Swiss-Prot record:
SUPFAM superfamilies: SMR domain-like. GO terms for cellular component: cytoplasm; nucleolus; nucleus. The keyword Nucleus applies. Residues 150-184 are annotated as: Disordered. This is Smr domain-containing protein C1235.03. Residues 157-171 have a biased composition (Basic residues). The keyword Nucleus applies. It is found in: Nucleus, Nucleolus. Keywords: Nucleus. GO terms for molecular function: endonuclease activity. SMART domains: SMR (SM00463). It comes from Schizosaccharomyces pombe (strain 972 / ATCC 24843) (Fission yeast). PROSITE patterns: SMR.
């Protein structure tokens, strides 16, 4: 029963989404019903794609026409020339760059633009960034000044009453360490803000970790919810798979030891996790922020969580997914040494992994309707499914290549090949065989044998390869005999070729 399902899935996945094809095939009781539904959907999708293509062409032509019209209008406008302001300047400035900056930042003074351009050594991009920052600072200062004016005007009489002097507690004269000073800065801005909801807090934490570790937010989302919303375990797993840890050398590791030791001493976390966080964040303040997040969340959410080499085991479904993912990472990488059977087996395994990831993506998408953070996890699973699909296609192609080079120079076994693959292989092998045998005498030609099988593994136990290869050889004007799942090619059928030319 699985043969016709696999054949329909393989054929219609080229025109429709593979997850949709898989669902229709699994819901159908017989091949005819499934084929009718899939055929109708494929025809409809092809028609839609053609209509969409023409709509896109018309839209692109209209946009191009609008852009040309806009360019013509802009070119008619005379640009103002500011280069006369450089006559009395002692700075060596590029007139073209200055003219562009002056026209873009007309609200800033000429002296400010000249100083910034000289500081950036006539670099247009750096100068633009510097001037944009200056403009933003000016606007923020104006807003703060207006706010202070409003607050000052509302100060009452009681605010000017004399306050009693209170003695400040005398602090020890011991100098603050680097960690202590940075800890005070981190504590001024709490990691988990009580005024925000749990969802908002998690969203802000994910954005912060994305900027520090340079990891996609979808991957952090997936890891966070896979570990039951526990930040300590999530951070440990992200750090463990982070790229810089695999590229670090012993000399570079020694540079981080002093700061990591201080972090471990003051946070109470292990030296290993402190070192790994410091290497991945590549900044002391960022590492301190991540460690404070671990410390705070393990106290508030998880209790006494120890970041050891072994974390708590997930449930049975998570274990199954992890085993399948580990299995996919251990698949053979020496592609050229694989046989056709091995390539087909690997392709089937990758297709199973693809279907599992698509199923997980659908589940996470349904959950995202109540919690938007699951949307990133759904995207992550969908991306994994696409990667597994590409790998399955790759190994399927390798299987066809291996099959094409199998057998001897005068024989070919097509077991395991699809009709399309078999046609390509037969054409190549028969052409190569005839190139060697064409110059020999007709009585000395050694025939070429093609084994197609009797169709015992086809849908409905009907042979498909044999009729397809027979039609192909007839079209290419070969002389052959076909019987009992085997085709013997003797050479070119010259009479058939002459009749077709006539």
């Amino acid at each position: 029963m699985q043969d016709w399902r696999a054949a329909l899935e393989e054929y219609y996945s080229r025109y429709l989404d593979s997850a949709l094809v898989l669902a229709i095939v699994n819901d159908s009781d017989d091949s005819n019903t499934a084929r009718e539904i899939l055929e109708a959907l494929s025809i409809e999708s092809q028609c839609d794609s053609h209509e969409e293509h023409w709509d896109n062409l018309r839209r692109d032509e209209q946009e191009l026409l609008n852009l040309k019209t806009l360019d013509e209008e802009i070119n008619k406008i005379d640009e103002e020339d500011f280069t006369w302001e450089l006559k009395d300047s002692s700075l060596e400035l590029d007139p073209d760059v200055y003219n562009f900056l002056r026209s873009m930042f007309s609200d800033l003074s000429a002296a400010r633009v000249q100083l910034v351009q000289a500081k950036c050594q006539n670099d247009l991009v750096r100068s633009s960034d510097e001037l944009l920052n200056h403009r933003a600072i000016q606007e923020s200062e104006q807003i703060e000044t207006a706010a202070d004016a409003l607050i000052t005007s509302n100060i009452g009489h009681r605010s000017r009453q004399r306050k009693k002097k209170t003695k400040k507690a005398t602090n020890s004269r011991k100098p603050l360490s680097k960690f202590q000073s940075n800890t005070e800065e981190v504590n001024e801005d709490p990691i988990l803000k009580p005024s925000l909801s749990v969802w908002e807090n998690n969203r802000l934490l994910i954005e912060k970790l994305t900027s520090i570790l340079n990891i996609p937010s979808s991957q952090i989302n997936h890891e966070f919810y896979k570990n039951s919303s526990a930040w300590p375990i999530t951070i440990r797993n992200l750090i463990h798979r982070h790229q810089p840890l695999s590229n670090i050398t012993n000399n570079e590791l020694m540079k981080y030891q002093e700061e990591a030791t201080q972090l471990a001493k003051d946070t109470g976390l292990s030296l290993k996790i402190c070192t790994d966080v410091l290497i991945c964040s590549n900044d002391y303040k960022n590492a301190l922020w991540i460690l404070c997040l671990i410390k705070e969340t393990q106290h508030n959410e998880m209790g006494n969580i120890k970041l050891s080499s072994q974390t708590a085991k997930s449930n049975s479904s998570t274990q199954t997914k992890t085993c399948l993912n580990d299995q996919s990472s251990k698949l053979v990488e020496d592609d050229e040494a694989l046989s056709a059977e091995d390539c087909n087996r690997l392709a089937e395994e990758y297709l199973e992994l693809r279907n599992m990831q698509y199923s997980n993506s659908a589940k996470e998408y349904r959950r995202s309707k109540s919690n938007h953070l699951f949307g990133g996890s759904a995207m992550y699973h969908a991306q994994l499914g696409r990667e597994y699909h590409e790998k399955a296609l790759k190994y399927r192609s390798l299987a066809m290549r291996s099959l094409a080079h199998s057998g001897t120079s005068h024989s070919l076994d097509l077991h395991g090949a699809t009709v399309r693959e078999a046609k390509t292989i037969v054409r190549e092998r028969v052409a190569a065989w005839w190139a060697k045998e064409a110059d020999t005498s007709p009585n000395s030609i050694r025939p070429f044998v093609i084994v197609t099988g009797r169709g015992n593994h086809s849908i409905g136990l009907e042979a498909r390869l044999l009729p397809a290869i027979v039609r192909l050889l007839q079209q290419d004007h070969w002389r052959f005999d076909a019987e009992h799942g085997q085709i013997t090619v003797y050479g070119i059928n010259r009479h058939s070729k002459l009749n077709s030319n006539a």
